[in-house]
Design a protein with these regions (language model features):
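C-terminal amphipathic helix plus adjacent low-complexity
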Residues: 330-386
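A donor-sugar binding/catalytic signature common to diverse glycosyltransferases
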Residues: 92-93, 115-116, 143, 267-305
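Donor-nucleotide binding loops and adjacent catalytic segments primarily
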Residues: 37-40, 45, 65, 181-271, ...
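A nucleotide-sugar donor-handling region in carbohydrate enzymes
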Residues: 38-42, 139-211, 314
Length: 433
């Protein structure tokens, strides 16, 4: 089996690092393809060294362009590389333009796509990432869903449950892996104050003067904390444009930094009192490291963190930002609940599950793209109440059907093969020639 891994940004590299470790451990042949969406070549090489990863076999170097130009350049470069490499599967991770391009090119070449972090949905189509997620998943052959909620999103969109593997999220594996490296390599000096780590880069916040002003004025009032703010270049540009940067620079409790290296940032995050962010990945990292998270957005494709109690959506609401942070500070029971929120993303073995599932597909001859054999058959989709003691697997085998979704009362459930269906309703597909 040969795996081609397509990555383009720092978060993708971070989340795929434990998957690469697992592939290497099993001596599986693989090719690492870096599209170069975020970094110049030299910076990228240093990042791979810091995380103790092998250098990419291919570097496309698309750089920063419009979404259309970046996707087109990536697709053009990938097509030639995949013709040369001839992988059995192309793995992509997340929701970037590299994911979109990788999924489109591979599926057009009839190479199976494995999407790590499949099924995430914000249901906000103004976000380019949401478009990338949806389109990539329509091209995907193996869906590595991080949670059951993500798996259900895929089922509702018509994905076959046989191709959905609930793995947990590799961010847990990555945090555990990379924090060990950070403690060895990071040279950042951390103060003993109550640190609030702040990151902000999304267009809906930094391009909107009203929202940005509201967030900044909240920060200025939170002088009982030490707020450490590694400022993204685009964010700084807009802060200066809207005459807000000098206000932050004058505040003694706010420390403005240049963007930190990943290992330094991870160590900072792990020692924080709380985190304020509009990043999707940071919501996952915070709950993994038991750090209370306040998300500067009104929606999230990581709703599991909110439901678990480790994340609160505060948007750009000045009062809500201030009140929530003060509640965390003053109500120790509330703070403990956030710190001890159960991690919805698993036990740190997502990478192992991903490679196990991929090898199982390969061993069974299921890593193939071919037309369905029953394309001319009559599909009947039925809702049934199951009154007998029987599992999903046994029902499918006996009635030659495919259970799509299980309803336990009013709540949908993923149809795990060993699930007992007695007293539950199922939606199942039956093919009749």
């Amino acid at each position: 089996m040969k795996i081609a891994i397509v990555i383009g940004t720092r978060p993708e590299i971070i989340k795929m690092a434990p998957v690469i470790d697992e592939i290497k451990k099993r001596n599986i042949e693989f090719s690492l393809i870096h599209t170069g969406q975020h970094y110049d070549h030299e910076m990228s090489q240093q990042f791979f060294q810091d995380l103790e990863l092998p250098k990419p076999d291919h570097y496309i170097g698309v750089g920063s362009k419009s979404h259309a130009k970046m996707t087109a350049a990536t697709m053009k470069g990938l097509e030639d590389i995949l013709k040369e490499e001839k992988p059995d599967i192309v793995m992509v991770q997340g929701d970037t333009n590299a994911v979109l391009a990788g999924a489109l090119v591979a599926s057009k070449m009839h190479i199976p796509v494995g999407h790590v972090e499949a099924g995430l949905r914000s249901f906000d189509k103004t976000m380019p990432e949401e478009i990338n997620r949806i389109v990539a998943d329509t091209c995907t052959h193996i869906y590595y869903a991080p949670t059951e909620k993500a798996a259900l999103n895929l089922l509702f969109e018509g994905a076959c449950p046989d191709n959905i593997i609930i793995t947990g999220n590799t961010i847990v594996d990555a945090c555990l892996r990379n924090l060990k490296i950070a403690k060895r390599k990071s040279k950042i000096n951390l103060p003993s104050d109550k640190i609030i780590t702040l990151t902000m880069h999304r267009a809906e916040n930094v391009d909107n003067k009203t929202r940005l002003e509201s967030i900044i004025h909240a920060l200025l009032e939170l002088d009982e904390f030490l707020i450490i703010f590694p400022v993204h270049p685009r964010t700084r540009k807009n802060l200066e444009k809207f005459h807000l940067y000098k206000l932050l620079a004058k505040a003694e409790h706010i420390k403005l930094l240049k963007p930190l290296g990943y290992l330094d940032f991870l160590l900072l995050l792990s020692n924080s009192y709380a985190v304020l962010t509009d990043s999707g990945g940071l919501q996952e990292e915070a709950i993994t490291l038991n750090i209370p998270c306040l998300t500067l957005r009104y929606n999230t494709e990581r709703p599991e963190t909110v439901e678990a109690g480790g994340n609160i959506l505060v948007g750009a609401d000045k009062k809500r930002i201030i009140d929530t942070l003060k509640l965390i500070q003053e109500d120790q029971n509330f703070r403990r609940k956030m710190i001890n929120a159960p991690n919805p993303y698993g036990d740190g073995k997502a990478s192992e599950k991903i490679i196990n599932a991929t090898f199982d597909f390969y061993r069974k001859g299921k890593l193939t793209i071919k037309p369905p054999e029953n394309i001319l058959s009559d599909l009947q989709r039925e809702l049934r109440l199951i009154e007998e003691d029987i599992t999903v697997e046994s029902l499918e085998e006996r009635e030659d059907c495919k259970v799509r979704i299980v309803y336990d009362g009013f709540k949908p459930k993923f149809p795990h093969q060993t699930m007992n269906l007695k007293g539950k309703q199922v939606i199942c597909d039956i093919y009749k020639i």
